[in-house]
Amino acid sequence: MKRKSFSFIALILSCTLLFVLQFAVQPVYAAEIPYIQKILDRGTLKVGLPPYTTPPFYYNDLKTGQLEGYDVEIARDFAAELGVEAVFDRDSASFNDLVRRAGAGDFDIAIGKLGTTYKRMSDAHPHEYMNFRHAILSNRKSIAAIQGNIPDDEFAAVLLESKMRIGFIANSAYDTFAQRYFPNAKRIGFKNWTECKKALFDGKVDGIYRDATEIKKIVYQTPSLSLDYVPILFEDVIDQKSIYTSTNAEVQIGSVLDYFISREVKVQSDSQIMESFYDYYRPNI
């Protein structure tokens, strides 16, 4: 009886040992790419986001206070594909500063309707995920004075060479674009988009300059403005919106980000965005 008990106990111990050894030799998942392993060890994807509010791209929900938006969800989805959560840094001083900090490695990626310029590409590496037409919202009287009898199909070139007063957000891509495309204009940078719009409505500038989604949003939400102001879209001048990475991140996860964009996001135009987020562009009632 004792021998049987001993044999039974030995069998249990043997099975237990085999069970333990089975799990002990199971490989622990580790990424071969060091940068991805660093993200996994940290448990989060660090994401830089502009210090502004720009629905439907990034904003705090009025009811919950939670950070929401198209760009926010892209960042969260990318983080989820890597097996971590996204954490957001909104402490940059401006759009340009955000890109600079991305290049310096303050976060893994920077997103937030960030335009692509040569200056920014000297700071960080861009990955295009949207492309929007350039646009201006201008006072009708100012435009009429510049156009005169010039046919509409010839007016764009004349407008770009004009001496109009044009407003934009300082230290943004449109600060750079204004210098390039409006060399003769009086260019005035403002702290934010609200101040830009106020300057236009107060008559301090003849037009304000940004991408089509922001210009068309103004007249879509308040149709009565079209009596005095006219949106002008430049069909052949495109603002390529990019997600930015540092050189270190680019070398190790740039291809992963491109794969994610091509499969899960796909490059969106301003028309596609406005159709997808109709609620943000419909008239205020």
Language-model region placement:
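Periplasmic-binding protein-like
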Residues: 51, 130-138, 143, 212-261, ...
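A ligand-binding cleft/hinge motif common to bilobed small-molecule-binding domains
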Residues: 96-97, 113-122, 177-180, 194, ...
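Extracytoplasmic small-molecule ligand-binding "clamshell" domains
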Residues: 30-113, 121
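Alpha-to-beta junction loops
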Residues: 45-46, 83-85, 103-112, 164-165, ...
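Ligand-binding clefts/hinges and TM-proximal coupling segments of bilobed small-molecule sensing domains
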Residues: 30-32, 163, 168-182, 186-188, ...
